[in-house]
A protein has these predicted regions:
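Secreted/periplasmic carbohydrate-active enzymes, especially glycoside hydrolases
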Residues: 1-10, 18-376, 392-395, 418, ...
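Substrate-binding/catalytic cleft of secreted carbohydrate-active enzymes
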Residues: 362-365, 372-613, 620-639, 655, ...
Length: 703
């Protein structure tokens, strides 16, 4: 058996090919093959050699269609990575086609073949060899189709995908969430794709593209963890199958912690659910950033005494609660949830970011000292959830029910579908603690969203009774009292009022609703590293072209102090970690960009506000001089602000000491510093535990 499987792998490497042009094939590399055990399950990356064209092309689904003049692209891919970030709200929204030719080895005969797409924005119709396979509506969840019966083993096969991101107001077909939002609605196959091979009897791949295994943490304490393992089996053969399901939990060293076994009979061409119970004594808990310990669950399926499928899933054991007065508790202990909201976006890449991009994002998140992220406003790629599991980042993840609803059965059903996909695809990630139902649902006038919100909340509870539901609101409305906990999106000091109003608002809300847990799901202000003014900065017009970095910094200083001093705020996620594409925006330094990020859209430059949070959240020694990029000054007398977690800082101007300052809030100020004509060297020095730390910059005054 093992020899045969090795022959199949060699055959795949030799003959599974991609079409760069008609009759011109490049063999897939060994890196494109992910071999899972010896169970007969195989995953082949399906990302290179796609042909692409914008527009609705007649007969593009046909197997013999000539696509030689189309562009060749690799996945992930979007057609809005450039026009979706340049402003004007005129980026292309409509259909486009992807095609790929590949040869299926004859050894695949008898295997089940599935195609999986990480996401497609927003409606995808899939064809294989000219035959319609299926349609998926929704721009952010993975989807899987069984294409076994559409393939011709030993011959060239063609898969064609029509993807459409037409604006909802242009077609009733596209009445799916989100109808509108403050981000570019990019089209494309903007996550990775794969071919997956299994034996006829296997763990299901088509249960809303879930892993087919659900690990329910029924009760977890410091002393024990009661678990239920549910495995969805599929039998795509003509005969009933007697199967044995063996499930094992392994510790991080690879040692077996617990094993259970169950027998089941699966009828032909049907599925079956197998439940298994187990208890783990004295569990090593997943404890966030402190200790993100992970077990591994391995489920093996045997048929006729042969191993026919095997799948692994992460397991992080934890228990938690939210208190309306004292905040969040993880494993019985107070645990501060502070962090960032994100978007899947990067300059010139759009939503087609890579896993390497996600790993860089995680490095930034870890470095700033965040303990939580809000995956706004939609489901993210699986790599981000995996990284959060690994590094102990608590996750709020949500569906794109943003701004408004539509009074139609199809809209409601699709929202339910997207929520089901979100929960089932991410059920086993220990980092995921909260299911988000909606965001700012009253922003656009429309039907009363309350019935749909209630329905979705009930669905989330049915799908997963172990996790709290949550929502992000900017309004005072009855929808605020549907989900288990709540986040408020408040922009005091940006869209209204003063930044100092935030604390007053939070106190009032808590006083009026003492039994309702409240957090901050969004707060932020725009800021450009190319726009500066002397301290103290003036509050700019939000819709104007001037968004100085100094005001953004001051906004976050005031806001964080209001949050930090109120223990009843159960979490806070600032808006946003990165600047991101929102093509309808006409403000700040660059049109088409929401510039509230504390790092630029290209992820290359950290703004001063980033360092404000780092000095508060990360205990590692640091010194940072603010306004570094304010390199040319038009006044000789300036205020210098430095962040540090040292108790004392000494500032030098052109090598001359301007004295030491002390601070209890990480902010150090030198006022009325007189710059010399020409270039000025500024250096801030701290001594922490006997080691010197410093930061340095150069500013010019005069010509």
């Amino acid at each position: 058996m093992k020899k045969l499987l090795l022959m199949i792998i060699f055959s795949i490497m030799s003959t599974l090919v991609t079409n760069a042009a008609p009759r011109s094939h490049d063999p897939i590399s060994t890196q494109d093959i992910a071999w899972v055990g010896s169970a007969g399950r195989m995953t082949l990356q399906f990302n290179s050699g796609w042909k692409f064209i914008k527009g609705d092309i007649k007969d593009a689904s046909h197997a013999d269609f000539v696509d030689a003049q189309w562009s060749t692209v690799c996945l992930p891919h979007t057609w809005n990575n450039l026009d979706g970030q340049d402003g004007g709200n005129d980026y292309y929204r409509g259909p486009a086609w992807y095609r790929k030719s590949f040869t299926v080895p004859k050894e695949f005969d008898g295997k089940m073949v599935f195609v999986r797409f990480g996401a497609a924005g927003f409606v995808a119709d899939v064809y294989v060899n000219g035959r319609f396979v299926g349609e998926h509506k929704g721009g952010f969840a993975a989807f899987v189709f069984n294409i076994t019966g559409f393939l011709r083993p030993g011959e060239t096969n063609v898969i064609a995908v029509r993807v459409d991101n037409t604006a909802p107001d242009k077609s009733r077909e596209f009445q799916i969430a989100p109808i509108s939002a403050d981000f570019t609605m990019e089209g494309g196959l903007y996550r990775r794709a794969s071919l997956m091979l299994t034996n006829p009897v296997h763990i299901s791949l088509t249960d809303y593209a879930s892993p087919g295994i659900f690990i329910t943490q029924k009760k977890v304490t410091d002393k024990f963890a009661d678990l239920r393992l549910t495995t969805i089996l599929s039998n795509d053969s003509r005969s009933a199958a007697d199967v044995v399901v063996k499930s094992a939990v392994y510790d991080s060293e690879g040692g077996v912690v617990k094993e259970v076994e169950a027998r089941s009979k699966v009828g032909p061409y049907v599925g079956n659910k197998v439940d298994q119970e187990m208890t783990i004594k004295n569990p090593h808990l997943w404890n966030g950033r402190i200790d993100p310990y992970l077990y591994k669950v391995v489920v093996s399926v045997y048929h006729d005494n042969k191993l026919v499928d095997r799948e692994e899933q992460p397991l992080g054991l934890r228990y938690y609660r939210v208190d309306p007065d004292s905040g969040f508790y993880l494993n019985g202990q107070p645990y501060k949830l502070h962090g960032v909201a994100l978007h899947e976006d990067r300059k010139d890449e759009g939503r087609a970011i890579t896993d390497a991009d996600r790993r860089q994002e995680m490095r930034d998140i870890i470095a700033i000292g965040a303990t939580m992220i809000r995956m706004s406003h939609y489901q993210y790629g699986q790599e981000m959830y995996r990284l959060c599991d690994k590094y102990g980042i608590v996750v709020w993840t949500e569906i794109p029910l943003v701004n408004q609803t539509v009074d139609s059965k199809s809209f409601s059903e699709n929202a339910e579908q997207q929520l089901t996909e979100l929960i089932r695809q991410n059920y086993n990630h220990p980092s995921v603690l909260f299911w988000g139902i909606f965001n700012e649902i009253h922003n656009v006038r429309g039907p009363d969203p309350l019935p749909l919100v209630r329905k979705l909340n009930e669905l989330a509870k049915k799908e997963d009774p172990t996790r709290p539901t949550t929502s992000a609101s900017d309004d005072e409305d009855s929808t605020n009292f549907v989900t288990d906990v709540l986040g408020m999106n408040k922009y005091f000091g940006w869209y209204y009022g003063s930044a100092r109003d935030l604390g007053t608002y939070l106190d009032k809300w808590h006083s009026e609703h003492p039994n309702r847990a409240i957090g901050l799901s969004e707060y932020g202000a725009g800021g450009s590293v190319y726009q500066h003014e002397e301290l103290p900065a003036n509050q700019p017009r939000t819709d104007g072209p001037w968004h100085p970095e100094e005001y953004q910094t001051e906004f976050h200083e005031i806001s964080w102090k209001a949050i930090e001093s109120r223990p009843f705020i159960w979490f806070s996620t600032l808006w946003n970690m990165y600047d991101f594409a929102s093509d309808s925006r006409r403000e700040g330094f660059r049109p088409g960009i929401n510039d509230k990020g504390i790092i630029t859209q290209g992820h290359e430059t950290k703004k001063d506000a980033y360092y404000w949070y780092k000095v508060n959240w990360n205990p590692e020694p640091m010194v940072h001089i603010n306004s570094k990029m304010f390199t040319v000054r038009d006044t000789p007398l300036i205020t210098v602000e430095v962040y540090s977690n040292a108790s004392n800082i000494e500032l030098f101007l052109d090598g001359t000491s301007l004295g030491k300052k002390s601070s209890e809030d990480h902010r150090f100020f030198w006022r009325d510093v007189k710059l010399n004509a020409g270039s000025n060297s500024v250096r801030a020095v701290a001594l922490i535990d006997g080691k010197e730390y410093f930061d340095q910059c150069w500013w010019r005054f005069g010509k």
